[in-house]
Amino acid sequence: MDIAAPPKTITPRFDPRDNGLNAIRLVLAFLVIVSHSWSLGGFGEEPTLGDATIGSFAVGGFFAISGFLVTGSRLRLPAGAYAWRRFLRIFPGLWVCLLVTAFVLAPTVGALRGGWSLPDALRYTGRNAPMVFSLTNEIGTTVRNVPVPSWNGSLWTLRHEIACYVLVGLAGFSGMFRSKPWLTAGGFGAITGVVVVLAVTDTRGLVVTFAVLLSFFLAGSALLRYGDRIPLTAPVAGLAMVLLAATIATHTVKIFGALPVAYLCLWTATVLSGQLRKVGSRNDLSYGVYIYGFPVQQLLFLAGASSLGPLTFAGLACVAVLPFAAMSWLLVERPAMRMKTYGRWGGFTHRALPGTAA
């Protein structure tokens, strides 16, 4: 009698070199632009699903994918190499974006409507470059009298992303981090409990925001650590969809939506057709789309594009951001990532675990 084959789990099904995560991240970056189009275009509140905007869903997906990939990176690499790669992935692209915004985009707007000055531009770049202090949103008065007076309201998530990187980096110093995967699952359960308490007590602010994003990040981490036990199949994906729909209906996406979102991102990455999986495999524009989307939308608003309606405004922004994202990848991000093996940290690796280049 034939014995049914066990369901395929995440570890054997997820191919680190042939998956659709980059394509999914690109879609998520575009969804952030679409979501922001309502507020930046002056059309009112952003569309929501339950208690989360479309942009919030996208950011949650980003953090879940990062949790999966970055945890794998930390398990493979010593601390120095891990920190160096994380630095290269975030800061070169960010710093050039800040410079382009402060010394190209803002002066262009300033030439037409005034309000730009060199001290303001230097303050904007210097304050935001470390991603440590509270962020400066304006450069003089160049984006005053617009619906959202900020040059880049998307950058706030990077501080939380970096904090997650630091936590994983520190956890990697413990031998139990490698030998005891339940610690990751326990961390996810604990932070979910914290989010529940914060929601019940109606607590608001930076702590709540970080707790929610950390829960998505740790959901991805937990799927990585238990990848040899968790099935990655259509029936389980269907269950995840049902659970996610339930969180939307009950307005608890930010409390209980992390795990289904993380699972669905991974499952979708494995079932995409071959051509779709290739999107972003060589040229990953997702980060550039994310960090340049907001300033591009501000330029479009100042040019009067919001008169075309929210969806057209969003579509124009998605197209207009592509040259910025392409230049960011080709001229900044990709050259920076080629430096990941330079220096004394290059070549030192631990046993391989699932994950794409991170």
Residue ranges with predicted function:
Residues 242-334:
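Alpha-helical transmembrane segments of multi-pass integral membrane proteins
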Residues 91, 95-162, 166, 262, ...:
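Membrane-interface helix-loop-helix regions
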Residues 16-21, 47-59, 147-160, 199-216, ...:
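Interfacial loop-to-helix transition and helix-capping segments at the boundaries
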Residues 70-77, 103-109, 170-179, 196-200, ...:
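Structural signal for the C-terminal ends of transmembrane alpha-helices
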Residues 2-8, 58-89, 93-116, 296, ...:
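Juxtamembrane transmembrane-helix termini
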